[in-house]
Curated annotation (Swiss-Prot):
Residues the entry annotates as binding ADP: 13, 17, 267, 310, 411, 415
Any single biological process term in GO: glycerol-3-phosphate metabolic process
Associated pathway: Polyol metabolism; glycerol degradation via glycerol kinase pathway; sn-glycerol 3-phosphate from glycerol: step 1/1
Gene: glpK
Protein name: Glycerol kinase
Amino acid sequence: MSEQYILAIDEGTTSTREIIFNYAGQQVASVAREFTQYFPKPGWVEHQAEEIWNAVQITTSTALINSAIRPDQLAVIGITNQRETTVVWDKETGRPIYPAIVWQSRQTSDIAEKLVKDSYSEMIRQKTGLVIAPYFSATKIRWILDHLEGAQERAEKGELLFGTIDTWLVWKLTRGKVHVTDCTNASRTMLFNIHDLTWDQEILDLLKIPRTMLPEVKSNSEVYGETDPYQFFGGRVPIAGMAGDQQAALFGQLAVKPGMVKNTYETGSFIVMNTGEEPIESKNNLLTTIGYKLGDQVNYALEGSVFVAGSAIQWLRDSVKLLNSAPESEQAALESKDANEVYVVPAFTGLGAPYWDSEARGAIFGLTRGSSDKDLIKATLQSLAYQTRDVVDTMQKDSGIEIPVLRVDGGASNNNYLLQFQADLLGKKIERAADLETTGLGAAFLAGLAVGYWQDLDSLKEIAKTGAAFAPKMEEAERDRLYAGWQRAVLATRVFAHGKDF
């Protein structure tokens, strides 16, 4: 029998990547394709779900061709995806009735604000582990049903289906035969009770969302169905592992013990701590969520979501034209002569954890006549580290666990300047994953375990290795001074946006 491989579909916010892994966890092929971002109004972010599906088809076929691997050589497919992004489609035609509303989008702020005003915050936090925010899928579904004529009635008749991107891709791969999600993606909808692991009827009734729209919720590692040959180059391949991108990265880093933490620097930055089999309720605006579910065992997590991280570097490149490429930011930061006096608060779509302020907007502080482009680039890079410290400090306070090491992955973790500054600012060791594509690796691990490609967690430990490590070098007094400046900058940004003090 010829060697078998695993295909991981890593569907992100700005691009789709397909990675083919072998048994040793090595990448045999990796192909990425960007798709269009739509900004119909200020603060709105949308995707075309069919464009995402087309990107998956193109990258899959290219990966298979480049590696000379046939569909029948794929043992299994794993999927990981941008979370919360919401698609509603016609059950019969399979066509979306509205563009996908992206997790970053603020077009549903009014719905979230009304829920807060009507005093539903505590009920929703207790059931879902989440704060009320336009970030999550629930308000996005409600917005679509409100703004498309006849959509509410059609939903009540069972004519419309909802899914996050994982659900949409499984639906397409199986040619409409399977409508499922996994518990990590479900836990990001603001509709899922993370304690009894079911869609919460009280919240569904509150938002008038028919239960018939919602997918069946499965574990992260089981066979959900198989590809339809028409949709997958003539092959029938089991789809058997699925997780939201940040939970997939947690699993890809094998952060499987309570207290283990990872940070993924991508479009946003997402710090996730494994808290074990009991959920920890945050007192400081972190999210209590599901880390992963294997069989009947659920592992919970605390998460701090930063909305703008790598996308701040893209802003420097694409909008203000200070960079030709993102990797140039490292050398620019090293050449900066300023004494870390400039602060960039990249609240382009509001502030995430622990502030949850959707009205805040980006700002720059500390400029002088001598400030240069390199100073601005360095300050933007540093903003990723400052926002991470906001979350790590809060996470330690909520959990009572001192975090000795932060494991990192994602595109921006290639930047050595960023990781050294992160270590300095936290006063903690930073370990970079040897394979930065830990989201795809996590999806592959989950899928492989489901079909016996790998037997158990022990067999994965030789694959998930760490690469370079960064130890803190900064004096504590300097660390505290810099962070105090960041806190003043964030406060000033919020005061400006709201016209009041905090």
